[in-house]
């Protein structure tokens, strides 16, 4: 730990007007930063979350939006301030140093399922703005409007979570890969804590019932979990469990789901609705058949 950082922090604490702080020790600061880094290391999905938060913060700053205090995840972490996720220096905002020395992560994981979790983050960031409105115009594309004084501001923000998967895999520590068999086994039991693209209760239930045997199965579940296709799950589950499907559309158990299947002229005879392709399908397409559980 850099002593210069400690001096900077203690100097800032000493300048606060409304609260008296005792000096922070190098051990206390090191412990907090270690805790946050350990939290990131515990699940690769959390590192992806930080990347997405950085992108979101950059978009907000470019639209003259100030990330203000009031929510635990964004403002009260000195580590997130140092890495640029938030521009709010928690010391200058006179937030108690006790927040630096205890975990603030319980319940703070934001599910970015199909991009909709960005909606919640945007609302947190825009706290205190007048006439704030955030809508998702299409999967992963958000239109944010708010009043800045008397001026109506508008910003469009695109964060397609699944499209970030390849970049996320390049940033995680060596030895873990989204296609490894241990991860597939965990997912087959619905153990998806910290896996931000499979966090909902319904998806956990699906994973438990479906018992995915390959990355292809995981991609299929992601693609099904969307309005217009979610009702296909019971039939696909039945076909997987019974083996009642032919060679056509084998990856999706005989029912067309993916975008490229829409180009098949025989699809008109099937009577199945195909919605917009999930980003997961596009991002994971090269890997879909490479990993099978033994």
Feature locations, PLM:
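Mg2+-dependent phosphoryl-transfer active-site scaffold
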Residues: 1-17, 37-38, 55-60, 67-70, ...
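Helix-rich "cap/lid" substructures immediately adjacent to catalytic or cofactor-binding pockets
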Residues: 25-68
